[in-house]
Structures are given as C-alpha cells and as structure tokens.
C-alpha cells in the first residue's frame, strides 16, 4: 500500500476523485464553511446522525458536489493522536473489506495537523490494512492500493508523514518475522533477516555461530541452545549514522524462536504462541529497518541472541549450574526461565561498545502480563533519566510503558547455596525478580529492560504480532540525536574470575 501527502483544504478536497473520502471531525469543528463537505458535516452533527466522539462513523454515497464515491465522517473528539488512531482504525477496518482501492484521509477539518496527528493516521491505516501472507498458499489480494493524507499545510505535516512511513516499514518488518511459524523463523533464518538489512545504508551485520560464542565464554546462552538441533546465532547489527567517537545506544532483543519451556515444559494449550518469544528480536530488526529510512545522526548497536528452547537429550536440567560470560555462575531452577539466560550474556557482550545506554527488549514473564495486561509494557531501569526518556517516548508514540520497581529486596529470592545466583525466585513479583536477575549483569552502564510479554502479540481471533515496541524505540532513539556525545571511559565491569563454561554445545 502506497501513501501520499497532499495539500487538500476542505474546499479543494470536494473535487478529489477517490473510492472513499475519510474526513476526521473534531468536537470543535469550525462552522461556516460554504463547501459541500463542511455543509454535510455541520448538518450531520446538528441532526445528531454523527457524534464527534472517537470511533463514531457516518457514511454517505454519491453526495452532490463531492467527487468521492463514498464519504465517511469520523469523530475524533479532541483530535488527540490517540483519538485519531481510534477513528482511522474504525473507518479503515470497514473500508478495506469492500472494493475500495484509493482512499483520501482528510485532516483538514482539524486546522493544522501536527506531525503526531499525521503519524497516528498513517500508522492506523497501515495497521488496518496489514495481512500476513508468507506461509499461505492462496492469498486474497488487498484491494486497497493507495492512501492520500490530505492536510492544510504541507510544511507542518511533512515531518510526521516521513517519520510515519519509516515507522510503518519498521513495524511491518517486525510483524513479518514475529508472525512466521518457528520452522520459518529459525535462528539461522533470523540471521538472514538481519543480513537483508545490511543491504541498506549505514547498516552492518555480523553473525556469530556456536564456535564463536563458545570462544567468548557465553556459557549461559549456550546452555539454553544445547537441547535443540537448530544451531544458535548471535546477531550483531550496527547502524552508523554518526562519527565513531559518538557512543552508541545498544538494543538487545530476546531471540528465542520457539520456547517449549525445555525440561520444565509448558502446557500444550496455546503453546503455538511461543513462536512469538522472539518478538524482542523482531522489534530490534524493525527498529533498524526504520533507522535505515530516516538516517538519524546517531549510532545504534543491536544484539540478538537467537536460539530455540527445546527438551532434547542434551537439554539443560533443573539443578544444573552454568557459567555466564561475566564469570558469574547461575543455578537453573526452571528451564522455562531461559530468556534471562540468553540476555545476561548479551548484556556482558554490550560492555565492549562503551554504550551511552543499553535497552533490552524481551517477552520475559507471564507475571508482567498479569500486572499490566496488554496495554503497557513493563519498564525497569537503573537510571532515572533513561527511564524517563523511554516512558516519554512511549507516550508520544502511543506505545506506552509503565515503570516498575527494582528494589534490592527483590533480589533476596535469587539467592542459592549452589551458585552465585538462581535463575528464578518465587512466584510473587516474578516480573521484578526477573529484572533483578538481569540487573546483576548491567552494572557498568545506564540500562533499561522492557518486558513486552503482554504487548508483543494478541491472541484470539486477532492473533498476531503487534510490532510493539518499535514505535517506542524509534521515538526514544530519535530523541537521543541531539544528546549524542563522544564515548567516555566506562568503569571496568565487576565480575568474578571467569572459568570454563559448564555447558557445552555442538559446533
């Protein structure tokens, strides 16, 4: 589907030929326009046939004086970005099912459409029209081919429009890989997706296999992978949009391409959804796809530890002790708490980049779903400035998160008699204790953890990946462009003396 930004005031839009004209109507709509469209909106509001509330719709066909075949008036209340998204989603869900090929979305009734409004409208159109088709033998063609965003001032709307197009590409790239079945998105294939991104400007990719990972001493990551015949991959992406002296932001995405739980096996019900356990990795890939479009002046590193978690004959067992890349030993009390085991080695690896900040993204805990549901992602951080920046980015991008506690008392449950740390505590506060485990490996840099277990995908009839938190991550990164600073010497990471990893893996 193609998008176009066009100067179309209300008076001019009446002569715009299209299959459907979607006009967003705010609650403070100015009266007095003498064009047919303004007259139609005023009459509908006065008669009570239309309410200027988000999601309220009124359709009219072959309206005199209007060239569009169909006119849809959609209320947007106070015209906030959130309300615009709600209105466009409602209207486009209806329009995409007909023979509509060209839609004009008019923001002209809202006076000057700010960039955030334009972005919300474009992203909502994309979400409504998205259809996964990669593994289907027969696909009904999407009839909707073009969406024109009509505004009063191009100069005001252009920044939001350009950003929205990049964001749409990032979200759809993330959705594509998250939605693929596990046998179509193995660690090797995921590495191929990263290599695909390396064709784009300023992106470089390096892929490490089992031998390289073993040489690095990533015993925790290797332990998770030893139960599967699919070889692990450690994917390193670099977006280099600034000078080498500029310290990068590091994004780490959990890449468990299928999670059975291992020996601590999950129940069979809805286990198919465990293909979504790599949504953190998919969000990193999607963010890099968007960065390639926008070319911001900053440096970003993406790290993806990719593996399956399977109950094979060599699989990790409850009670095993493994040695992480940091040298810390970990007792495995539950093999279904594998995400933190791959992330902890990635956090240690991130130290070599002397990062400005590190953000890990993971479908980590069911406890976070219980706490926050599917509305907000869980945010944990050891740095207030970083946490505030991420939270603000979540609000502005309509991809919200909620900061959770990281009190030291939560780490008490991770104590064990047999290693430096256990990989799980009790059930209480499970999202927090998981974050406290990761916190141990992030002591030398500003760090944040986004638990997206409740927001990365939807179940039921609308089952599929959401593409979150690509919008949040992109907004955060773009906000860091002016804050870019040369690398500073980082304090040496405190770690125990490294010993040979307990767990081994196939080459």
Swiss-Prot record:
Q: Where is this region: Disordered?
A: 486-507
Catalysed transformations (reactions): Release of an N-terminal amino acid, Xaa-|-Yaa-, in which Xaa is preferably Leu, but may be other amino acids including Pro although not Arg or Lys, and Yaa may be Pro. Amino acid amides and methyl esters are also readily hydrolyzed, but rates on arylamides are exceedingly low; Release of an N-terminal amino acid, preferentially leucine, but not glutamic or aspartic acids
Question: Entry's InterPro entries?
Answer: Leucine_aapep/pepB, Macro_dom-like, Peptidase_M17_C, Peptidase_M17_leu_NH2_pept, Peptidase_M17_N
Origin: domain of life: Bacteria
Quote the subcellular location field of this record.
Cytoplasm
The answer to whether the entry has keyword NAD is: no
Query: Where along the chain is Mn(2+) 2 bound?
Result: 254, 259, 277, 338
Please name the GO terms of the biological process aspect recorded for this protein, alphabetically. Answer: proteolysis
Query: Main subcellular localization, coarse class?
Result: cytoplasm
Q: Which residues, if any, are the signal sequence?
A: none
Write the Enzyme Commission number(s) for this entry: 3.4.11.1, 3.4.11.10
- How many cofactor units bind, and how? Binds 2 manganese ions per subunit.
Cellular component terms (Gene Ontology): cytoplasm
Keywords attached to this Swiss-Prot or TrEMBL record, sorted alphabetically, are:
Aminopeptidase, Cytoplasm, Hydrolase, Manganese, Metal-binding, Protease
Give the residues annotated as active site.
Answer: 266, 340
Q: Answer yes or no on keyword Ribonucleoprotein.
A: no
Give the record's family classification. Answer: Belongs to the peptidase M17 family.
List the PANTHER family: CYTOSOL AMINOPEPTIDASE (PTHR11963:SF23), LEUCINE AMINOPEPTIDASE-RELATED (PTHR11963)
Official protein name in the record: Probable cytosol aminopeptidase
Q: Which organism is it from?
A: Polaromonas sp. (strain JS666 / ATCC BAA-500)
Gene that produces this protein: pepA
């Amino acid at each position: 589907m193609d998008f176009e930004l066009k100067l179309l005031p209300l008076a001019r839009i009446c002569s715009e030929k299209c299959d459907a004209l979607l006009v967003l109507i705010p609650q403070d709509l100015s009266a007095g326009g003498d064009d047919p469209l303004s007259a139609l909106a005023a009459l509908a509001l006065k008669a009570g046939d239309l309410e200027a509330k988000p999601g309220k719709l009124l359709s009219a066909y072959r309206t005199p004086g209007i060239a569009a075949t169909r006119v849809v008036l959609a209320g947007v209340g106070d015209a906030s970005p959130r309300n615009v998204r709600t209105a466009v989603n409602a209207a486009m869900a209806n329009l995409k099912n007909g023979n509509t090929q060209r839609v004009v979305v008019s923001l002209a009734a809202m006076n000057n459409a700010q960039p955030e409004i334009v972005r919300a409208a474009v992203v909502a159109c994309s979400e409504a029209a998205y259809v996964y088709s990669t593994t289907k033998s027969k696909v009904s063609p999407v009839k909707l081919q073009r969406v024109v965003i009509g505004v009063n001032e191009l100069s005001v709307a252009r920044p939001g429009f350009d950003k929205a197009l990049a964001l749409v590409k990032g979200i759809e790239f993330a959705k594509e890989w998250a939605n693929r079945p596990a046998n179509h998105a193995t660690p090797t294939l995921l590495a191929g997706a990263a290599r695909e991104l390396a064709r784009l400007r300023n992106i470089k990719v390096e892929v490490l296999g089992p031998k390289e990972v073993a040489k690095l001493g990533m015993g925790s990551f290797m332990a998770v992978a030893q139960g599967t015949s699919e070889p692990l991959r450690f994917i390193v992406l670099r977006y280099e949009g600034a000078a080498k002296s500029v310290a990068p932001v590091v994004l780490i995405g959990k890449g468990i391409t299928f999670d059975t739980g291992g020996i601590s096996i999950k129940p069979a019900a809805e286990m198919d959804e465990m293909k979504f356990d790599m949504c953190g990795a998919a969000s990193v890939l999607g963010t890099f796809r968007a960065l390639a479009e926008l070319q911001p002046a900053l440096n970003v590193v993406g790290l993806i530890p990719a593996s399956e978690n399977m109950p094979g004959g060599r699989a990790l067992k409850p009670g095993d002790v493994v040695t992480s890349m940091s040298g810390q030993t970990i007792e495995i009390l539950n093999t279904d708490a594998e995400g933190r085991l791959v992330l902890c080695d990635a956090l240690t690896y991130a130290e070599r980049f002397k990062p400005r900040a590190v953000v890990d993204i993971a479908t980590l805990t069911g406890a976070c779903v219980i706490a926050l549901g599917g509305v907000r992602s869980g945010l944990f951080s050891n740095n207030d400035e970083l946490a505030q920046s991420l939270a603000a980015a979540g609000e502005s991008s309509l991809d919200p998160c909620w900061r959770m506690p990281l009190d030291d008392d939560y780490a008490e449950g991770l104590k064990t008699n047999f290693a430096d740390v256990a990989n799980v505590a009790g059930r209480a506060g499970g999202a927090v204790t998981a974050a406290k485990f990761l916190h141990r490996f992030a002591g030398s840099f500003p760090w944040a953890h986004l638990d997206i277990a409740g927001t990365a995908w939807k179940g039921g009839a609308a089952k599929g990946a959401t593409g979150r938190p690509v919008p949040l991550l992109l907004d955060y990164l773009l906000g860091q462009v002016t804050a870019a600073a040369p690398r500073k010497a980082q304090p040496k990471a405190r770690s125990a003396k490294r010993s040979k990893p307990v767990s081994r893996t196939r080459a």
